[in-house]
């Protein structure tokens, strides 16, 4: 099957062109779905994923019809009920919205299962409107399912799922024996293991009931990589790795899939009391800790820090640099992670570094409240999709990074990302840009997401010395509720308490520009953080610019705090039930900024 990739820049350009050539009414009621496609590696011998663009205005759209070989096979909503772990939480969110306050998202994906191996299929999609009419067909996607792969079960090489046997060698032998296109099956059971090394052209499949449990022995995670070539610190391997010490270039590895209904557990921290989620399901929770308490709260985290300190490393550096993440894929061209549950990393969850054409679909992230327990991070990577996932994370949920300081100018930006149909619970931020912004974070579209209990909806953070920044950011058609802090923060005052990376300060300071936030509802936040907070450093001529906020409803939030901003607009933002003060607007030093067409005078 041909791998289909995409450019969000071209997709956005297409939407803009359509709006320019059509009246708003026609665009809202008659447009067929655009850019129907199959995400990278999201297919196998019996199924295929479909995703498509939605227009900027989705207010008149109720669903999408899915057609296979010209025959209607169902609705996107019904399909997501069956296949998306995010959908039940999204449905519960709207069920509780009795006042109909929130923006209604639309579902723009479907999984077609029950297909025959090695068989040609054609797919189209139609929009369903509120009046019951439908659009014309989308573009047609023609594809061929793969052949049935060779399957190797790790128990064939002696792996034992008893929760105590160390299976590193047995599982690695199974991976090494896997021919091109092979699938490695992990059956039901708890398979304890140290670092494993994936290779090109393979699928790792964790069956229902399977758990890969990280060893708690620091020696089982050898030195593996530097986060950037220009830093001195070396990090240990993750539990699952595609890393080559001699090359981080895109294409060093190709075509890696990690799929299945099983669990990847990093064994990083002790558990605290479990919680119940919105559906009544048990949620594992982990002890909130830091570098001063890791010896008491950690498992693998404790042992890795202790091992590093024993060699003479100071505790802060050991804590920052010597804890393993769960999954690190570096230099990979074409990667797909789907359906697995991610738990309890000693450090971060999933990391895609210097990779392209990477997709996360229907992953459940359960890392709350593990310190630094990000959900998924994209570092200097391009052509990214994240959809249908559920995030309950100890740090940022989806994070973009792009190097630090002057040397980052030699790196590629993180670019072309599309984030949609996700459900975000706890986290320090749902969609996060930075703090490592050196090479730039460019062209990110986050749409049709639901966010609740997270600290921040859209979080852009850096510091002048890091350089770069982010631009071409669109955050739209989403709903937020019960935020711990605020809806949006853009700041150059970020400082990482655990940060020990050595880098040369950038000659050109970081800044953020060309942001669009549109068609978003925000209901209730705790604390006193401004609902929208924007700060640069105008005293040093560091301005953010070209921000457009429009069509937002905010209730039960604190007033805004906006400074160091130029050439920007705030249109049709309605506030109710302010937590403090009588005016929602608080401006510092700004220039050429308007609210509903009126120039702001600080």
From Swiss-Prot:
GO terms for molecular function: exo-poly-alpha-galacturonosidase activity; polygalacturonase activity. It is an enzyme of class 3 (hydrolase). Its EC number is 3.2.1.82. Keywords: Cell wall biogenesis/degradation, Glycosidase, Hydrolase, Repeat, Secreted, Signal. It catalyses: [(1->4)-alpha-D-galacturonosyl](n) + H2O = alpha-D-galacturonosyl-(1->4)-D-galacturonate + [(1->4)-alpha-D-galacturonosyl](n-2). Residues 1-27 form the signal peptide. Belongs to the glycosyl hydrolase 28 family. One of its GO terms (cellular component) is extracellular region. Residues 32-149 form the Fibronectin type-III domain. Disulfide bonds: none annotated. Contributes significantly to bacterial utilization of polygalacturonate and the induction of pectate lyase in the presence of extracellular pectic polymers. It comes from Dickeya chrysanthemi (Pectobacterium chrysanthemi). GO terms for biological process: carbohydrate metabolic process; cell wall organization. The active site is at residues 395, 428. This is Exo-poly-alpha-D-galacturonosidase. Its main location: secreted. It comes from the Bacteria. InterPro entries: FN3_dom, FN3_sf, GH28_Enzymes, Glyco_hydro_28, Ig-like_fold, Pectin_lyas_fold, Pectin_lyase_fold/virulence, RHGA/B-epi-like_pectate_lyase. It is found in: Secreted.
């Amino acid at each position: 099957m041909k791998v289909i990739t995409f450019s969000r820049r071209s997709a956005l350009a297409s939407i803009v062109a359509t709006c320019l050539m059509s009246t708003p009414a026609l665009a809202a009621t008659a447009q067929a779905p655009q850019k129907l496609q199959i995400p990278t590696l999201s297919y196998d011998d019996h199924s295929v994923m479909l995703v498509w663009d939605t227009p900027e205005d989705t207010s008149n759209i109720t669903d999408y019809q899915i057609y296979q070989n010209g025959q209607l096979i169902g609705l996107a909503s019904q399909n997501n009920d069956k296949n998306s772990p995010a959908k039940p939480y999204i449905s519960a969110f709207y069920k509780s919205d009795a006042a109909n306050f929130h923006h209604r998202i639309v579902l723009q994906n479907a999984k077609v299962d029950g297909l025959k191996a090695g068989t040609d299929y054609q797919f189209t999609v139609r929009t369903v409107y509120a009046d019951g009419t439908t659009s014309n067909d989308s573009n047609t996607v023609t594809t061929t399912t793969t052949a049935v792969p060779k399957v190797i079960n790790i128990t064939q090489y002696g792996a034992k799922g008893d929760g105590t046997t160390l299976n590193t060698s047995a599982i690695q032998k199974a991976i090494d024996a896997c021919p091109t296109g092979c699938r490695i099956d992990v059956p039901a059971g708890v398979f304890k293991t140290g670092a494993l090394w994936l290779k090109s052209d393979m699928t790792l499949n964790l069956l229902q009931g399977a758990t890969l449990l990280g060893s708690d022995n620091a020696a089982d995670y050898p030195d593996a990589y530097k986060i950037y070539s220009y830093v001195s610190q070396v990090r240990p391997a993750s539990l699952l790795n595609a890393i080559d010490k001699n090359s981080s270039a895109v294409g060093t590895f190709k075509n890696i899939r990690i799929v299945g209904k099983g669990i990847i557990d990093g064994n990083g921290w002790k558990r605290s009391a479990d919680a119940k989620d919105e559906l009544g399901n048990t949620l594992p929770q982990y002890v909130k800790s830091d570098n001063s308490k890791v010896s008491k709260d950690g498992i693998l985290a404790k042992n890795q820090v202790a091992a590093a300190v024993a060699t003479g490393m100071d505790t802060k550096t050991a804590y920052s640099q010597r804890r393993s993440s769960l999954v690190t894929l570096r230099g990979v061209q074409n990667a797909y992670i789907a359906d697995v549950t991610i738990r309890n990393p000693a450090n971060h969850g999933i990391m895609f570094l210097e990779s392209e054409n990477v997709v996360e679909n229907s992953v459940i992230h359960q890392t709350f409240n593990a310190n630094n327990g990000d959900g998924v991070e994209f570092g200097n990577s391009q052509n990214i999709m994240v959809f249908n996932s559920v995030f309950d994370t100890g740090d940022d949920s989806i994070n973009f990074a792009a190097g630090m300081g002057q040397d980052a100018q030699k790196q590629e930006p993180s670019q072309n990302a599309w984030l949609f149909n996700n459900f975000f619970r706890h986290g320090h931020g749902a969609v996060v840009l930075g703090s490592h912004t050196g090479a730039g974070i460019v062209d990110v579209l986050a749409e049709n997401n639901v966010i609740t209990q997270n600290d921040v909806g859209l979080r852009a953070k850096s510091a002048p010395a890091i350089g770069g920044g982010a631009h071409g950011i669109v955050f739209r058609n989403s709903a937020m509720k019960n935020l711990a802090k605020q809806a949006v923060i853009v700041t150059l005052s970020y400082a990482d308490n655990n940060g020990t990376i050595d880098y040369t300060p950038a000659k050109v300071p970081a800044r953020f520009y060309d942001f669009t936030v549109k068609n978003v509802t925000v209901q209730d936040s705790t604390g006193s953080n401004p609902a929208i907070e924007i700060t640069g450093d105008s005293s040093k001529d560091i301005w953010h610019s070209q921000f457009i906020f429009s069509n937002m409803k905010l209730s039960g939030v604190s007033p805004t705090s906006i400074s160091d901003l130029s050439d920007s607009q705030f249109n049709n933002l309605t506030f109710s039930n302010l937590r403090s003060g009588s005016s929602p607007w608080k401006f510092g030093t700004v220039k050429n900024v308007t609210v509903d067409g009126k120039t702001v005078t600080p």
